[in-house]
Amino acid sequence: MSKKNSQTSPQRQKMHVKKGDVVQVIAGSDKGKVGEILRALPQESTVVVKGVNIRTKHTKPQQEGESGQIVTYEAPIHSSKVMLYSEKKKIASRVGYTLTEDGRKVRILKKTGEIID
């Protein structure tokens, strides 16, 4: 019998958020911060949120005469640590799915009933 390698690429998970959504961080050192999703990475189930999980990177000079730099960037966080956020009502909510009158499936905020997309 052949044994499956557990290190193969993980299955893509369905994520409750996507690029452009406004979310609130619900766990970790950045708990309570609100920001927009810049990038969604479904293979790792992570998202990059603007202004959240800021990391600093010290880069060496690459060419003669160039000086080194300290670069700050947003690192990814797990998608389970964010919740969709209503900017109108200033409240975080779980996501729900419903059909509109014309038959489109849309995402809604469960607490407010607000349609997201």
Curated annotation (Swiss-Prot):
SMART domains documented for this protein: KOW
Region (Disordered): 1-20
Family matches, as PANTHER family: MITOCHONDRIAL RIBOSOMAL PROTEIN L24
NCBIfam families according to UniProt: rplX_bact
Function recorded in the entry: One of two assembly initiator proteins, it binds directly to the 5'-end of the 23S rRNA, where it nucleates assembly of the 50S subunit. One of the proteins that surrounds the polypeptide exit tunnel on the outside of the subunit.
Protein name per its UniProtKB record: Large ribosomal subunit protein uL24
Similarity section: Belongs to the universal ribosomal protein uL24 family.
GO CC annotation terms, alphabetical: ribonucleoprotein complex; ribosome
Species lineage: Bacteria, Bacillati, Cyanobacteriota, Cyanophyceae, Oscillatoriophycideae
The keyword Ribonucleoprotein is assigned to this record: yes
Gene expressing this chain: rplX
InterPro entries: KOW (IPR005824), Rib_uL2_dom2 (IPR014722), Ribosomal_uL24 (IPR003256), Ribosomal_uL24_CS (IPR005825), Ribosomal_uL24_KOW (IPR041988), Translation_prot_SH3-like_sf (IPR008991)
One GO molecular-function entry: rRNA binding
Keyword set, alphabetical order: Ribonucleoprotein, Ribosomal protein, RNA-binding, rRNA-binding
Complexes and interactors: Part of the 50S ribosomal subunit.
HAMAP family: Ribosomal_uL24_B
GO biological process: translation
Keyword Manganese: no
Organism: Microcystis aeruginosa (strain NIES-843 / IAM M-2473)
PROSITE patterns in the record: RIBOSOMAL_L24
Composition skew (Polar residues), residue ranges: 1-12
